[in-house]
Amino acid sequence: RENLAGIKQTTFVLIKKEEAFHQLSEKRSRDIIFLSSNQSLLDLARDVDVPAIAYQKPETDTFLHADMVVEGFEEVDMTFLQRVYERHFNIPWTILETERCIVRELELSDLDALFSMYAEPGMTDYMEGLYEYEEELEYQKAYIENMYRFYGYGMWLVFEKKTGTLIGRAGVEHREELNGDMELGYAIRTSFHHQGYAYEVCQAIMQYAREV
């Protein structure tokens, strides 16, 4: 089946021996998503750069390590497989689309566009600006690793569909001052104010948060 990650079909292969895994991975390493409850095989997948899902059996105490860990298979659909594939190969998740916008995770190549947006007059009148470039780069590296990868949410980027222009940031985060409750935050590029983008995107994010 075709989907956004380029996965054209799903084939399930039962692997009983490590040799069979190596033979399969050598032929189609970018076309495999591996699922196992065996940490040794999951480690093999990591070593040959194959996306892996760990099945954590409910009765076991040992915690498995992989790109994703599941305790059941109800959530393992094509969207879930796409997320695993993208996370493994550092492809930013597209969170949602609205009529005019695409909301997706930040990747490091977005940094120049982010600095350009924050340089617009009035952009930081009511919020903090960015760090110096190198410090911001390190901050975003840590954010991608610790927020996106661990929690699966955070502050995302907002792009105008028609032009591909970065027009803002929006997302949800836990706030300690709110007793750990979720807070919706957003910032729209100054030159795109008063066009309904904030309302459009925030409504979609609230709906997304309720569903997931």
Segments (PLM) and residue ranges:
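Glycine-centered helix-boundary capping/hinge motifs
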Residues: 49, 152, 194-196
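Conserved acyl-CoA
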Residues: 7-8, 24-28, 191, 198-212
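GNAT-family acyltransferases
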Residues: 68-191, 203-208, 212
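Asp-based, Mg2+/Mn2+-dependent phosphohydrolase catalytic module
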Residues: 1-96
